[in-house]
């Protein structure tokens, strides 16, 4: 009975350890001299960041087609209803829809093929806020987009050179106005 109990505890701890090491944290910081309302799909919703504020977002392993973008010129009431000049997602603070163009996008899929995360920046939907996406572990590529048509970002859908990979379990830092 003791062996069975020990094995159950071992596999439980192993499962928890694997799950936590494969999830990712995105620390989203606003360095812009104006307020940015970052939004995140499929988890996270959205919130307001004034200059210098950071929002930490935990994203589960296995998340695919994740997106983070900045909204500008927003005005929300106490119930979270309102609108944004750029990146609006159906007139709500907590986004459940993608942002309306123009939006500079950080895109990601976590713990995919060969235990890798895949990430990119995209200005296919237009450019609205300067952005930098950097993995926190060494050896992975930092992407920066300071203006429309920036060289680190997708400019058209079939550009196979803009997606980058990093080992699963990596955390990321996204900075508006780096």
Give names to the regions the model predicted.
Residues 2-178:
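Extracellular low-complexity, O-glycosylation-prone Ser/Thr/Pro/Gly-rich "stalks"
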């Amino acid at each position: 009975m003791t062996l069975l109990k020990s094995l159950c505890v071992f596999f439980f701890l192993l499962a928890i350890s694997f799950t936590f090491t494969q999830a990712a944290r995105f620390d989203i910081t606003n360095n812009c001299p104006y307020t940015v309302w970052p939004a995140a799909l499929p988890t996270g919703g959205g919130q307001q960041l004034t200059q210098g504020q950071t929002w930490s977002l935990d994203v589960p392993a296995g998340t695919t087609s994740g997106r983070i973008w900045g909204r500008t010129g927003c005005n929300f009431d106490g119930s979270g209803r309102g609108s944004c000049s750029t990146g609006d997602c159906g007139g709500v603070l907590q986004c459940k829809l993608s942002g309306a163009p123009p939006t500079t996008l950080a895109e990601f899929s976590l713990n995919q093929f060969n235990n890798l995360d895949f990430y990119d920046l995209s200005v296919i939907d237009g450019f609205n806020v300067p952005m930098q996406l950097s993995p926190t572990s060494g050896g992975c590529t930092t992407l920066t987009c300071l203006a429309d048509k920036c060289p680190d970002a997708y400019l058209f859908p079939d550009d196979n050179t803009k997606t980058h990979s990093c080992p699963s379990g990596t955390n990321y830092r996204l900075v508006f106005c780096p």
